[in-house]
Amino acid sequence: TKGDKGISAAPFLNSYHRLDMYPQSMTWKLGDPIVDFQPLKGTTNEVGALFASLNFFDEMLYQKFTRESGNPLIKLKKFSESFGELVFPVVDFANYLGISLTDIQFLLYELTEFGFIDYDNDRMIITCYPKMFDYIDAQSGLKDFDKIIIQSKASVNAQLSLSSLDLKINGIERVLLSQAKKVWIMPTNNQLIVKKNRDMNFDGLITAGKTQYYGDGFSFLYEDFKLNLSKCDSMFIWADYKESKKAGQLVRSPSVIESLNGYIQIDDMDNKSGRDTSMHAFPKLYSNVETYVYYDDPSIQNGIYSRDNFMFIINPFVLDSLDKFTNQALSLNGTFMSGGIFPDFIDSLSLQEDYSLGFIRNTPSDGFNIYSQLASYDNEIRLSNEGLKGSGTIEFHTTTALSEDVTFYPDSLSAIAHTFTNIKQEDDPEIPLVKGQNCQVKYVPKENQLYANSIEDKFIFFDDEEADLTGGIVLGYDGLKGDGIMRFGKGEVQSLLYTYETDAILSDTAEFRLVSSDKDLDALSFKTQNLNARVDFGTRIGEFKSNSGESFVTFPENEYICYMDQFNWFMDNDDLEMKNSKQAAADINIDTDLDLAVSNFYSINPDQDSINFGSSKARFDVRRKKITCTKIEFIKIADSRIVP
């Protein structure tokens, strides 16, 4: 057991592991293969114990003993050298100093407590330990030293295996290996194994300057002064804050470098103290194998980039000055695999605006084919924890889109295109000229289709730019399709599915409307539904046929309704021709004695007492808002019939 002060507090000297050990007690049961170092029996709380390297040096401790007459360590050294022995009588040393035994004893107790000497009070003998000479040489700059102290706070501070001679130390928060280079370790389960001459095995965390490493099977080699990273699961980098108000502070990069195998050279093996500050390259990381950065974290585009095929493979590398490299200096060469979005290409990782590891690069002059398809992309590619993004030109079939905001997903491309152009194709299938601005674009390679949707600006169609679309279009090798509202002059068509020719709009099921004027597009003068539509800008005629026999037609401004099955709109004249080749609709229950063979017209003005009449043909003048009906047999008003 040990005491708290003086000779009783002197450390256990461990020459195999080369440690001064400061536990309260050492316990060994006869025949037991384990020696325990622990607090004294009866101690209820966990008690701290120190395990210090025999080459540990603390200048404050050295100066603690310095007096006006000098430092007693130097006097002990000089006397030992003059005496020619490391062991000598206390009386002789007291006479050498010219002081009494009583005056010197307290100093000798204190020097013994810190492991510089051994003072045998019974035999009145002083034994000088190597630590004393090392401290003097370290203070003088003649000898290197270290700063390694292991602090333990546990119910059992350490255990020595008599079979392997491994010293397992428990209750460790962290161990500083180099103060100058900012290297320390934090072992898993707060324990590590000390091997011969201060070598250590441990799992857990290593911090080396602005880098951190998590893993198992780590080892510290004292003589070489390096850390072996045999199984490093993950490496993190701490970057300098870019904001001026946070200058000098660090932020951890969200990117993880995985599967690292290599070692960290903490400092030159003869500069464990870090006193020689000219060695700027240390600490230095040597990565001996390919390492990987993945982008499958849920915070990155909801984790859509699978680590199975989307990664940056870093070549073996050397990274020096781990404690002071700049954001701009970090560059890790390797190969980017995008899961088939782009061809694999060589590049280098660096710190991005969000502090993640990524890159900004341009495509080759002729662009990249994307998704192994006929589509291509040209200009800037950006990789960060925002995902795989870019700003450039997207080309597919007859479409070219320019965007400053492109996001590449494994199964698709999404962009806000500030310019969208689909050139006209007169060969089969016919495709019209389409232009757009500030639209949403999505390319789906498995479907071989490009989708575009208007946001605020409409798509402009055809050579003369006579039609526009509020909605979406789909381009494939089978042609162009669309949905939404198409407007042309005073007419508009609404459909869930359009097909197109170079100068025509087609739809199997559509709603057709005419507006009162170009300025007021919400003031309807004509409306009908469920039509097969063809609007031809070559002939300047819109042809509409009812899909249900007759279509219900509304004239809001005229306050009339009718049923017709064919409509021809002559867009240059703003003139609509309506025909009915079938029986009048019979599902409107209006009291009338007419037995018409053509569709009925009905007034919906409550003051006109449900005026109705039959007409198989009519015209509607959009400009004048005038309905002209022909082949009317009579109009019944009250008890009278009017024959026009």
Label each region the model flagged.
Residues 1-644:
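Structural signature for solvent-exposed beta-strand/loop edge elements and short helix-capping sites
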